[in-house]
Amino acid sequence: MFEQICDINDIVPGTGVCALVSGQQVAVFRPTEEEAVFAISNTDPFAQSNVLSRGLIGEHKGELWVASPLKKQHFNLATGVCMEDERFNVKSYQARVNSGIVEISA
């Protein structure tokens, strides 16, 4: 089941926002001008803080990552895998844009 989050144009390209999905903080990212979005848990497992939506988006070896604004670990936007230590992955969510509306799988 997908929850409607916001209009795609509410997310500035190259940034992320935080959304509440089924009671969980989810970081939703729009890496480019295109209507492609990614969603992972907003909780940085290293800092135990809800900050990943404010991280910087980058690309490494053809994959998109977000760097935590606190301790700078990198998390894969598609899978939630931590580049520096795979023991500290974050949950990834199915995300899509449907008729201009961002939707996240609950």
Language model segments and positions:
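Short amphipathic
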Residues: 2-7
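Rieske [2Fe-2S] iron-sulfur-binding domain
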Residues: 18-106
